[in-house]
Amino acid sequence: GARFIRRRKVQKYIDFDRTRSHNCLFNFVNGIRGCGKTYGKLKDDIDRYMKGKGRFIYLRRSEEELKTLTTQKSGRLFNHVQTEYEGHALWCEANLLHIDKEVCGYAAALSTARKLKSDALDYVTDIIFDEYVIDDTTSQQRYLPDEVTAFFEFYETVARPGSRDYDVTVWFLGNAISSS
């Protein structure tokens, strides 16, 4: 007789629940371009916000990278993930990330992060550092001088170690690159 093979639904983005279950403060997720790292992490953080589990920060290296994503009116950061949230409006403007009329997160540039004040970043539980790896074979972008120190200073501004009863988890998202 005929055999029927049941196919599993192919997921179009990374599910971060398993990675989160390891309970690491810093998580590095590298994969091929377009495999759904940013989409999956935005979905994860939006879902967590909607369940009352805190806000998030979307971090990029420079302000230039944020211009079309979160700074300009109608920033396009949420364009693709919006389809997951029928009946809700997701939008970005002036580096504030919104669900309907509420602020669900913030966008920041590591290059100017020293200007941020921790009290303005209320109840942040996740930081997404998107495109943390630079592929210098295809990009004109460069790492910031003393970038690691700048990141740790930014992290301490947000997390305020010892002053909160929760941890701030960091998600470093990067494209897999080969080096010769």
Whereabouts are the PLM-identified features?
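Phosphate/NTP-binding elements of NTP-utilizing enzymes
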Residues: A2-S180
